[in-house]
Design a protein with these regions (language model features):
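A short glycine-rich, Lys/Arg-flanked "PGG" loop and its adjoining helix->strand segment in the class I
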Residues: 128-140
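Short, glycine-/aromatic-enriched active-site segment of Class I SAM-dependent methyltransferases
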Residues: 149-167
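Conserved beta-strand signature within the Rossmann-like core of class I S-adenosyl-L-methionine
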Residues: 142-148
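Conserved class I S-adenosyl-L-methionine
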Residues: 1-44, 58-62, 81-84, 88, ...
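A short SAM/SAH-binding and catalytic strip from SAM-dependent methyltransferases
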Residues: 114-126
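Short alpha-helix
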Residues: 168-184
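A short acidic, Gly/Pro-enriched loop at the edge of an enzyme's catalytic core
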Residues: 103-115
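Class I SAM-dependent methyltransferase SAM/SAH-binding core
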Residues: 48-104
Length: 229
């Protein structure tokens, strides 16, 4: 499948997610692993931040509070997700939402001081190209932060690839780090962010076999990779 076809498939799939209300529900699932990352980013009040794969915009609300003198741009390939984000957070004066894919970010070079992506990067059709684009729009000294739950070193998430309707990239921490370095990032490092939120006694969803499987997955932690331009 070509990159344009991959992007179209992603757009259609995440439009369906948006219409089902799944965009708004992502905050509950992702907040416990995202808050520690925001602390690690050491945001300044005047930072300009790009969120790649913003969904329905929940992270923009948190970011806008932390950078009151800066700008927050949420980008998503799903036009329906962006429509909902604009509706949900119309009152955020320093925030805007744009439709776009990471392979061709609709923004000028050297603008952002930080870029973040939460649970989006493994959907990118070409991670290397996406990271090069993020590097392009970052200022010198800016940093990129990619947070994912689906990665090769956590065996308890591998089943997701068969459950998702779109192509995914299951890479290891070392492979992601090499992608960062190949794109031109320096000071590349990675770590695990453990989800310490309570787990249910009984699990009836489709992503894990049972509650014990979910707990094992959470104990491995999400993978955070970051680097500097």
């Amino acid at each position: 499948m070509s990159e344009s076809n991959n992007n179209q498939a992603l757009r259609e799939e995440f439009n369906r997610w948006a219409e089902a209300g799944r965009g708004e529900g992502m905050e509950e699932d992702h907040l416990p692993i995202t808050l520690p990352v925001l602390d690690l980013m050491q945001l300044a009040p005047d930072d300009n931040i790009l969120d790649v794969g913003c969904g329905a915009g929940w992270l923009e609300r948190l970011l806008s509070e932390r950078v009151p003198e800066g700008r927050v741009v949420g980008m998503d390939i799903s036009d329906e997700m962006v429509r909902r984000a604009r509706r949900n957070y119309v009152a955020l004066e320093n925030t805007m939402f744009v439709i776009g894919g990471v392979d061709e970010i609709p923004w000028d070079a050297n603008f952002f001081t930080r870029a973040i992506s939460v649970e989006s990067a493994y959907y990118w059709p070409d991670p290397a190209r996406g990271l090069r684009e993020i590097l392009r729009v970052l200022r010198e000294g800016g940093s990129a932060w990619v947070l994912i739950n689906y990665y090769r070193d956590n065996p308890h998430c591998h089943q997701w690839g068969d459950l998702l309707a779109v192509k995914t990239n299951l890479l290891s921490a070392e492979e992601w780090s090499e992608q960062f370095r190949a794109a031109g990032f320096t000071n590349v490092a990675y770590e695990r962010i453990v989800d310490s939120s309570p787990s249910p006694d009984v699990y009836t969803g489709r992503w894990f076999h049972d509650a014990a499987h979910l707990r094992a997955f959470k104990s491995e932690g999400a993978l955070l990779i970051h680097g500097t331009k």
